[in-house]
Amino acid sequence: AGELVARCIVETGTSSYYAALGEATSEPVLKEICRRIAADELRHYKLFYDHMKRYLVADGLGFWRRLWVALGRIAESEDDELAFAYHAANDDNARPYDRRRAARAYARRAYALYRRHHVERAVAMLFKAVGLKPQGRLSRLTVRLAWWSVRHRSGRLARAAA
């Protein structure tokens, strides 16, 4: 069940990213591709969530363990994979890979795409996966904190790049 919680978190991230990217572009083909990918990621989330519910009791995976798995997976999203992918796709091949620089460049572009409703949906999906009320008071507080964090980090990265 723990791996299914982690998969729900991955699908939360990818669906919110493609929804944000699709809404940010004016290019109709890219907009449609992103819409379809985001919808597909939501279907994956539902599949993993439904299976996770089946295994929770058998695996003895309570709230705290689910929360730990989810937070661990969120932390892993800051790992080398996205930074290196950004470097490979955007940097001059002669330029050596610098994880910190590539991670910041990727985050600067990605965070700028997000709007509050993307954060609201991501928090609701996260809360649902760990067993919290997706529309409760704690969720609303988390949305405010997460949205502030996205805006703050986006602004800081943009200023640093200027």
Predicted feature locations:
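Non-heme di-metal
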Residues: A1-A162
